[in-house]
């Protein structure tokens, strides 16, 4: 009879209900926390993109203080012509000789560089199977000066003229600036230890040998180093297209450090704030901004011109005009 609880099956025992008893709508609340954004395909272990990424050979990251190997006949010959300090010239046995290879061997012998002949398979292994044309040049790490030593040497030959590079990334620009510093009577170059081009074979080659005469120092903290130099009487002038001081109005006869910004972003905020003045180069209205190394060369040329013919104090010039 309906309502008779004594009838078999009239009362369902607890826990005997079919289906899930626990869930978002069950007896216990289920956490609904999200799992976060979906990772990129190459980071998912079983995705085909991840398998392709794992299959690709990984090139080790080269540190700035490691030995560098220059590959190819033209690059090696340019390094030897520029006087890049090298420790060994590797030539694969059986390599077909031409004028470039012959000149490389002759210049290495004249410079006292060890000439090592080895099997092509060994040269392939040494260069990680990169294209080498049967020849490679081993270049040791550059011996950087200390910023304090660089400043002391510059102050011994007053007025000091130094160039600091704020995160310049292209070693060719670094080499070109070193060359301009040598051409216009500068005393050295300062670069940050991180996020900056270093003195590699490319930079040395672009400097046309000036890197052998102009010291390059590396600063752990560029802003702090520039502050220390300013405390010792060196005026810090930044170079930027939006600078408030025209190059024509800069007195280049004082001890100076010219700060050149990176190719894309220019001067960083902290470095810009610690400059005594920010200088711009007057240009025609339709002209675009100059390359970093070209702009540095223009400023150094103007400073050298003023030092060859020191300008009169502004007060005397105004009185004479009156």
Curated annotation (Swiss-Prot):
Cleavable signal peptide: none
Protein name: Uncharacterized tRNA/rRNA methyltransferase Rv3579c
InterPro entries: Alpha/beta_knot_MTases, Ribosomal_eL30-like_sf, rRNA_MeTrfase_TrmH, SpoU_MeTrfase, SpoU_subst-bd, tRNA_m1G_MTases_N
Pfam families: SpoU_methylase, SpoU_sub_bind
Protein EC: 2.1.1.-
Region (Disordered) location: 1-69
GO cellular component: cytosol
UniProtKB keywords: Methyltransferase, S-adenosyl-L-methionine, Transferase
UniProt superkingdom: Bacteria
């Amino acid at each position: 009879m309906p309502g008779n609880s004594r009838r078999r099956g009239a009362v369902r025992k607890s826990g005997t209900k079919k289906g899930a008893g626990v869930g978002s709508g069950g007896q216990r609340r289920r956490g609904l926390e999200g799992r976060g954004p979906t990772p990129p395909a190459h980071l998912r272990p079983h995705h085909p993109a991840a398998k392709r990424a794992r299959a690709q050979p990984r090139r080790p990251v080269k540190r700035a203080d490691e030995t560098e190997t220059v590959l190819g006949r033209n690059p090696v010959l340019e390094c030897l012509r520029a006087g890049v300090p090298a420790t060994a010239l590797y030539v694969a046995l059986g390599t077909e000789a031409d004028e470039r290879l012959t000149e490389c061997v002759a210049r290495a012998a004249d410079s006292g560089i060890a000439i090592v002949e080895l099997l092509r398979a060994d040269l392939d292994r040494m260069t990680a199977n990169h294209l080498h044309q049967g020849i490679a040049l081993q270049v040791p790490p550059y011996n950087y000066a200390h910023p304090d030593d660089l400043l002391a040497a510059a102050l011994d030959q007053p007025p000091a003229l130094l160039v600091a590079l704020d995160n310049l990334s292209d070693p060719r620009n670094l080499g070109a600036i070193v060359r301009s510093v040598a051409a216009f009577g500068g005393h050295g170059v300062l670069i940050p230890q991180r996020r900056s081009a270093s003195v590699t074979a490319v930079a040395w080659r672009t400097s046309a040998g000036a890197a052998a005469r102009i010291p390059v120092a590396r600063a752990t903290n560029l802003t702090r180093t520039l502050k220390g130099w300013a405390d010792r009487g060196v005026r810090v002038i930044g170079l930027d297209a939006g600078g408030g001081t025209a190059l024509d109005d800069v007195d280049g006869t004082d001890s100076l450090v010219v700060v050149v910004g990176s190719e894309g972003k220019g001067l960083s905020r902290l470095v810009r704030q610690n400059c005594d003045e920010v200088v711009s180069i007057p240009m025609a209205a339709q002209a675009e901004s100059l390359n970093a190394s070209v702009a540095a060369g223009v400023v150094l040329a103007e400073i050298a011109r003023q030092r060859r013919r020191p300008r009169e104090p502004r007060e005397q010039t105004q009185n004479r005009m009156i």
